[in-house]
From Swiss-Prot:
GO terms for biological process: translational termination. Responsible for the release of ribosomes from messenger RNA at the termination of protein biosynthesis. May increase the efficiency of translation by recycling ribosomes from one round of translation to another. InterPro entries: Ribosome_recyc_fac, Ribosome_recyc_fac_dom, RRF_sf. It comes from the Bacteria. GO terms for molecular function: ribosomal large subunit binding. This is Ribosome-recycling factor. It comes from Limosilactobacillus reuteri (Lactobacillus reuteri). The keyword Cytoplasm applies.
Length: 186
């Protein structure tokens, strides 16, 4: 059976991973600026196999609101253009014969508000994940207490520590989401 400290450390690690996952998810929500990660999910039909865009082309940011996609193999230019359209990112690629330029449109106020709603929805999912970790840790602690692995005082102390970690984890998630909201509305 795991010790109280092991249960607490495992819960801390899982809660930290929820924060990392939220950060990664929110990075994909664009804020009106060019960012190569906007194209992370794009798969290009490259000789019959769906291949991530970053493996068939270099993605650079020549200006604040422009991406430049330069294929390693110019024959794949049309497939790259089709893949960007098919990804439904709301972006319009412009093929100039040797590379593809993508202008990132300014976000409208309405679109910004929609994106903030998306941020809040992702925040809620992450909070649920943290609460599930808390529940698992509490269940493990109760089982350990019942099995006699630690006494009632240790159990209550560990229970408080798990709750403190949960509160800290949720506060961290809220800070991550608040930063993204500021970025979107800024």
């Amino acid at each position: 059976m795991a010790t109280g400290k092991q249960i607490l450390n495992e819960a801390k690690d899982k809660m930290a991973k929820s924060g990392d996952a939220l950060r990664r998810t929110l990075a994909d929500i664009r804020a009106g600026r060019a960012n190569a990660s906007l194209l992370n999910g794009v798969k290009v039909d490259y000789y019959g196999a769906p291949t991530p865009l970053n493996q068939v082309a270099s993605i650079t940011i020549p200006e604040a609101r422009q991406l430049l996609v330069t294929p390693y193999d110019e024959s794949s230019l049309d497939n790259i253009e089709k893949a960007i359209y098919a990804a439904n990112l709301g972006l319009t690629p412009q093929n100039d014969g040797s590379a593809i330029r993508i202008l990132i449109p300014q976000l409208t106020e309405e679109r910004r508000k929609e994106l903030v709603k998306d941020v809040k929805a992702e925040l809620e999912k992450a909070k649920v994940a943290v609460r599930n970790v808390r529940r698992e840790a509490m269940d493990d602690l109760k089982k350990g207490n019942k099995d006699g692995d630690f006494n009632d005082d240790e159990f209550h102390d560990l229970e408080k520590k798990v709750q403190t970690e949960t509160d800290n984890g949720i506060k961290n998630l809220e800070n991550i989401a608040a930063d993204k909201e500021k970025e979107l509305m800024g």
